[in-house]
């Protein structure tokens, strides 16, 4: 037996038609894609309304606003972060870093005064 049976031919024809329809459905119409409307925040709404009138001073005010936001976020905030880190984590000034003082033993010399710590007295009758 050679060739396809009538059922197989019908199935192949239906699959080809389904594939043609699917490919045709993938083509976008001129009005697609439909994008959802953008939600604007309160500041963006304000600036859009403010800039509707195209006067030069309004554009200058908006430019100054944009530059000040840039300076605040890219200069001041990083400088504050670096200052905080340097002040509380790196500096050796008094109270900059609080750390535990090292132990002092008999015979040690105190650097600031040059004083030598005397040996401890022995108390033979007390048991600690």
Curated annotation (Swiss-Prot):
<keyword id="KW-0812">Transmembrane</keyword>
<feature type="modified residue" description="N-acetylthreonine">
    <location>
        <position position="2"/>
    </location>
</feature>
<dbReference type="GO" id="GO:0005739">
    <property type="term" value="C:mitochondrion"/>
</dbReference>
<comment type="subunit">
    <text>Complex I is composed of 45 different subunits.</text>
</comment>
<keyword id="KW-0007">Acetylation</keyword>
<dbReference type="GO" id="GO:0005654">
    <property type="term" value="C:nucleoplasm"/>
</dbReference>
<keyword id="KW-0496">Mitochondrion</keyword>
<comment type="similarity">
    <text>Belongs to the complex I NDUFB6 subunit family.</text>
</comment>
<dbReference type="GO" id="GO:0042775">
    <property type="term" value="P:mitochondrial ATP synthesis coupled electron transport"/>
</dbReference>
<dbReference type="GO" id="GO:0031966">
    <property type="term" value="C:mitochondrial membrane"/>
</dbReference>
<dbReference type="InterPro" id="IPR019174">
    <property type="entry name" value="NADH_DH_b-subcmplx_su6"/>
</dbReference>
<protein>
    <recommendedName>
        <fullName>NADH dehydrogenase [ubiquinone] 1 beta subcomplex subunit 6</fullName>
    </recommendedName>
</protein>
<keyword id="KW-1133">Transmembrane helix</keyword>
<keyword id="KW-0472">Membrane</keyword>
<dbReference type="GO" id="GO:0008137">
    <property type="term" value="F:NADH dehydrogenase (ubiquinone) activity"/>
</dbReference>
<dbReference type="GO" id="GO:0009060">
    <property type="term" value="P:aerobic respiration"/>
</dbReference>
<keyword id="KW-0813">Transport</keyword>
<dbReference type="Pfam" id="PF09782">
    <property type="entry name" value="NDUF_B6"/>
</dbReference>
<dbReference type="GO" id="GO:0042776">
    <property type="term" value="P:proton motive force-driven mitochondrial ATP synthesis"/>
</dbReference>
<keyword id="KW-0679">Respiratory chain</keyword>
<comment type="function">
    <text>Accessory subunit of the mitochondrial membrane respiratory chain NADH dehydrogenase (Complex I), that is believed not to be involved in catalysis. Complex I functions in the transfer of electrons from NADH to the respiratory chain. The immediate electron acceptor for the enzyme is believed to be ubiquinone.</text>
</comment>
<dbReference type="GO" id="GO:0045271">
    <property type="term" value="C:respiratory chain complex I"/>
</dbReference>
<feature type="transmembrane region" description="Helical">
    <location>
        <begin position="68"/>
        <end position="86"/>
    </location>
</feature>
<dbReference type="GO" id="GO:0006120">
    <property type="term" value="P:mitochondrial electron transport, NADH to ubiquinone"/>
</dbReference>
<keyword id="KW-0999">Mitochondrion inner membrane</keyword>
<dbReference type="GO" id="GO:0005743">
    <property type="term" value="C:mitochondrial inner membrane"/>
</dbReference>
<keyword id="KW-0249">Electron transport</keyword>
<feature type="modified residue" description="N6-acetyllysine">
    <location>
        <position position="24"/>
    </location>
</feature>
């Amino acid at each position: 037996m050679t060739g396809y049976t009538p059922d197989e031919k019908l199935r192949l024809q239906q699959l080809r038609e389904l594939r043609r329809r699917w490919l045709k459905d993938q083509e976008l119409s001129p009005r697609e894609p439909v994008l959802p409307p953008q939600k604007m925040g309160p500041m963006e709404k304000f600036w859009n309304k403010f800039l509707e009138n195209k006067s030069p001073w309004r554009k200058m005010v908006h430019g100054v606003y944009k530059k000040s936001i840039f300076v605040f976020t890219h200069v001041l905030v990083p400088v504050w972060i670096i200052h905080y880190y340097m002040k509380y984590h790196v500096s050796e000034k008094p109270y900059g870093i609080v750390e535990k003082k090292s132990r002092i033993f008999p015979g040690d010399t105190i650097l600031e005064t040059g004083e030598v710590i005397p040996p401890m007295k022995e108390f033979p009758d007390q048991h600690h």
